[in-house]
Each structure stands twice: as structure tokens, then as C-alpha cells.
Regions:
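Conserved active-site aspartate in kinases
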Residues: 241
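Small/polar glycine-rich anion-binding or flexible loop at a beta-alpha turn
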Residues: 302-312
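Juxta-kinase regulatory segment immediately upstream of eukaryotic protein kinase catalytic domains
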Residues: 1-26
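Long, compositionally biased intrinsically disordered regions
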Residues: 353-356
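ATP-dependent phospho-/nucleotidyl transfer catalytic cores
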Residues: 27-31, 52-53, 59-63, 118-134, ...
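Conserved ATP-binding subdomain of kinase catalytic cores across diverse folds
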Residues: 25-174, 248-250, 261-262, 266-273, ...
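Active-site activation/catalytic loop segments of kinase-like enzymes and analogous catalytic loops
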Residues: 251-294, 311-330
């Protein structure tokens, strides 16, 4: 996609019903890898909004994606109201275009959408305290619980086979066979690591196929920075980045949070000696998550959560390494070998999880381990 200029941004902003003219700043907002995110505000500075260009290379059906987002947020608003909450803060609120559409298509084929800005909130890039991590866990568990009766059949699949780990493995094998940039020679140990875990990739989908765990409506990208936390009270407010809300497994959402939160390093830490999986933080998160989502989960589903942590971390590493082999087209990179560093960090975490996996199972399912 072409870069976003101030004139392009202003043109997109003018298409939305912000209640009056808005001012734009062409500096990107936030830490997201995929979409282009900006903050705009009314000329009188009375209100801010998020304006975002959807990455249509990744999300090829932006209209369908926005149907998902609008349907899910409408459902969440009803739940939040019924629980006595504040739907203006506790879920995303979509701003329509002036013509009443959920997104705006620009002259270059770019797709734009807008949300109310949720003020006085923060999102964590790394876990700052156990309390913060438990708050994230409780918020994500509540989100899943609020969606337990959402009609999954109405959802568009925004990214086909997104958490299909065997398919991610197959895509890696294709990229390895093609070796388009001649990079495979640099990563022999990483290749061996993935090959040794081919069977692990099938564990969760085999459990689903056997009817041991249920298909749910899940977020599918529950990095800790996708939860907004009230800056004053420290309470969890809102789950954001709903682009990948689709039918999925509870293990996916649980696992991705552990992947990003239960360690003391950045996702792209180049020094592997600094990468440490924190079993205690895993336990903190598990207890928080199960406190809000666990009542409707079977023993088998709770047990699958530990596998989710392990497989989402493995899968993410496979994705980073696949992108490295293919030329770094999917994830934004800031330096050479950025995706390789990301992959190595994931694989280090997987190794460490494997060493304490019995304890991980015991924590999520103490009565049936």
C-alpha cells in the first residue's frame, strides 16, 4: 500500500461523521504491525478519534471485517449495559461515514474506519506488575464470556486459517522449499527446531475434531497491548483490535497472552540470554482468566489452555521465520534480520515452556492433571 500523506489522511477524515471538521497529524499512533493508525481531533479539541487505514493486503474483505466488528461491538454494548457498565468506554464504538457506511474506500483502494478515542487509558507493551497482568487476564476472560452466546455462523473469516497451526507449518515448508532470498542457510538450527515439533502443531485441532474442546467466538490476537487499562484506577476497560474476531479456541486467546506477557523481554529481543518464560506470571494470568471465563469451561478445555500457550508461541515463531524466508513482506521490520530475532525469541520461550509443561497443566487444571 502507498504511504499515508497528510492530504490523504485529511481526505479520509473528511469522509467520516465526526460531528464537525477535524484536524489530522500524519504521525502513526501506537505499536501495531499491520494497520496504519492515526489520531484526529475536532477543531475545538473537544474530542479525539482513532482513524485507521486497514491493511487490505492482510484483510482482503474490509467490508466483511467491519460487519464483524459492528456486530460484535453491538452485542458487547448490550451485555455491558445489562451488567451496569459504560459501553462508551468498555467496547469500541465505530464512527460511521457521512453516507452511513462502516468504512470509507479512497481513490487508491484504501479502506478506512474510525472509532471514538477511549480517553484516559493506557495499554501495556510489557507486563509492568502482576496486578496489571491479572487485570489483562480478567478483562480478556470477561470478553470471551460476553461472547459465549454470539452467533459464530454470522462472522466472516477475516484471515483464512489464521490460527491453523498445521497450515502455518505447511506454509513454512513452502517458503523453505522456495528459499526465495537464499536465507535458509542462515537458519539451520531454527529449521530443525520447527521440524522436531511438527506433531505438536496438530494437538489443539485434533482435540477440536474429536469433540473434546468447543469452538468459540474468540479474539485471536490477544497480545497484552490489545487491552486498554484505566490510567487512574488500573482497571481493565476495553478489548481493542477486533479485526481477527472469528470462531476459534479459548486456547488461542489464552496462549497468545501468555506468549506476549509471561516473559521479561521484548518480542524482538536480539539477545536470547535475556529471554525468560515466567511460570509465576503464567499462574497469575491463568487465575485471572479463569476467574471470569472458567465457569463455562470443561476440564479438557482448561487443560487445552496450557497447550495454547505453547502452540501460539511456536506458531508465532513459525510465522516470523516464514516471513523472514519470504522477504519480510508481512510484518513491519525496523532492521535487518528483525523477523529472525522475533522468531528466535519465540522458540526460546517454547523450549522453556516445554521444560515446565507439567506444572503449566497443573496450574490450569489442578483437579484433573
Amino acid at each position: 500500500m502507498k504511504s499515508v500523506t497528510l492530504s490523504l489522511l485529511q481526505s479520509a477524515a473528511n469522509a467520516f461523521d465526526f460531528g464537525g471538521p477535524v484536524l489530522c497529524d500524519a504521525h502513526h499512533y501506537g505499536e501495531g504491525h499491520i494497520n496504519d493508525t492515526f489520531v484526529v481531533w475536532r477543531e475545538d479539541h473537544s474530542k479525539r478519534f482513532i482513524l485507521q487505514r486497514i491493511n487490505t493486503d492482510t484483510f482482503t474483505n474490509p467490508v466483511g471485517l467491519m460487519e464483524n466488528v459492528c456486530g460484535v461491538t453491538r452485542h458487547l454494548r448490550a451485555k455491558i449495559l445489562a451488567e451496569g457498565g459504560d459501553p462508551a468506554r468498555e467496547t469500541l464504538n465505530v464512527i460511521p461515514t457521512l453516507s452511513g457506511s462502516t468504512c470509507y474506500l479512497d481513490a487508491d483502494g484504501g479502506a478506512w474506519r474510525a472509532y471514538d478515542f477511549v480517553e484516559d487509558t493506557i495499554c501495556l507493551q510489557q507486563v509492568g506488575s502482576e496486578t496489571d497482568f491479572r487485570t489483562v487476564a480478567e478483562t480478556l476472560g470477561k470478553f470471551q464470556n460476553q461472547l459465549k452466546d454470539y452467533p459464530a455462523s454470522t462472522l466472516h473469516e477475516t484471515i483464512a486459517r489464521f490460527h491453523d497451526t498445521p497450515n502455518r507449518y505447511a506454509n513454512f515448508e513452502k517458503a523453505l522449499a522456495a528459499d526465495a532470498l537464499g536465507r535458509a542457510k542462515n537458519i539451520t538450527s531454527e529449521i530443525e527446531f520447527i521440524h522436531a515439533r511438527e506433531q505438536d502443531c496438530h494437538v489443539l485441532l485434533d482435540q477440536l475434531a474429536a469433540g473434546e474442546i468447543p469452538l468459540r467466538v474468540t479474539h485471536n490476537d490477544t497480545k497484552i497491548n490489545n487491552v486498554l487499562i484505566d490510567a487512574a484506577t488500573g482497571k481493565g476497560i476495553c478489548v481493542i483490535d477486533l479485526d481477527t474476531v472469528m470462531p476459534g479456541l479459548a486456547a488461542y486467546d489464552f496462549g497468545d497472552s501468555i506468549r506476549t506477557g509471561a516473559n521479561d523481554c521484548a518480542e524482538d529481543e536480539p539477545d536470547q540470554s535475556k529471554v525468560h518464560f515466567d511460570l509465576h506470571l503464567y499462574e497469575v494470568f491463568a487465575k485471572g482468566y479463569l476467574s471470569t471465563a472458567g465457569a463455562s469451561m470443561s476440564m479438557a478445555e482448561k487443560k487445552s489452555l496450557a497447550w495454547g500457550a505453547r502452540l501460539m508461541t511456536l506458531e508465532c515463531g513459525i510465522r516470523f521465520l516464514t516471513d523472514y524466508l519470504e522477504g519480510d513482506h508481512y510484518f513491519h521490520i525496523a532492521r535487518p534480520d528483525h523477523n529472525l530475532d522475533r522468531a528466535r525469541t519465540q522458540f526460546t520461550l517454547v523450549r522453556q515452556m516445554e521444560e515446565v509443561f507439567d506444572q503449566m497443566l497443573e496450574i490450569v487444571c489442578p483437579d484433573n492433571h
